[in-house]
Amino acid sequence: MTAAVAGRRAPRRPPPTAPAWWADVAGALAALSLLVVTALWTADRGVQELLAGAATGLTSLGRLAGLVSADLMLVQVVLMARVPLLERRFGQDRIARWHRLAGFASFHLLLTHVLLTVLGYAGTARRGVLAETWDLVVTYPGMLLATAALALLALVVVTSVRAARRRLRYESWHLLHLYAYLGVALALPHQLWTGADFLASPLARAYWWTVYLLALASVLIWRLGLPAWRSLRHRIEVAAVVAEAPGVTSVWLRGRDLHRLPVRAGQFLLWRFLDGPGWSRAHPYSLSAPPRGDLLRITVKDLGDGSARVAALRPGTRVLVEGPYGRLTGQHWRGGGITLLACGVGLTPLLALLW
């Protein structure tokens, strides 16, 4: 075993840390984006329209709900784009909670936008709600795409409810969750072609193009680009597979210049083992030993299809990685006694910390 996984010792570069003030800046930027959206709505006679009659007021409120919904939708895209500064400052658990809150708030506001807009247009045109809904969907530019976007986002929200999520495998839930990106993309033409702010205000157009492009850049750079670059750079592969106990397997992984991968004991990565069909599904596994030069170790318990495949991995199998993620590291310890609680295979990050 020792000979099979012996690796050269190389000084590990300490992973970068996010400054403490970054938390305040990130929160301020998110709040500022909501204020800007409200200010743009106000500048486009949003408040005056509230007082111009019931139908016009409903339409104006619906427009505000749609704008705030779109802004929150982009905020949640950035939250889950795995931007390193956000990950290091907050950790994925907190980011995931905020993403969930922003997502549900955005969807509820989106439903409010649809309801108020239909009621407002129906009141102005003096026709029935169903007839007005049909007219909006069929005749307005981008509305068919927006309807498809609403259906996709509804699917994501329904499967994110805890009762529904417990019935789904993680891999299935994660795949369904990715449809949110398609939903955001399909909603954009509606805003471009029929959105009052886009059509009437150059300042609003500049703002929305900026935030859409920033969200897109965040996904392309941090969610897709960085993991691809690290996987190509480090060329990680399975070095050895060790049966630790019935149903428990450790995998040693070797790579090029792994001492440059900014990972600490206690963190986890998303692993894709290129061992055949199903390789595209990522699995979150924590390090079960501190990084050693050009070696990493994970320990996995057989709890499902993905983890069961780990025991059958062969040395030389190539691996794609995302991460590292997580804030359970010695970096945040400031001295004094601590209590670490874990059970089952959840012990693995603590083993790495206490090694």
Where are these regions (language model features)?
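Short, intrinsically disordered terminal tails adjacent to the first/last structured region
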Residues: 1-12, 256-257, 324
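N-terminal membrane topogenic signal
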Residues: 12-30
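Helix-boundary and loop/linker segments of multi-pass membrane transporters
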Residues: 19, 57, 94-96
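Membrane-interface segments at the starts/ends of alpha-helical transmembrane spans
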Residues: 51-61, 131-140
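Ferredoxin-reductase
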Residues: 62, 228-320, 329, 336-338
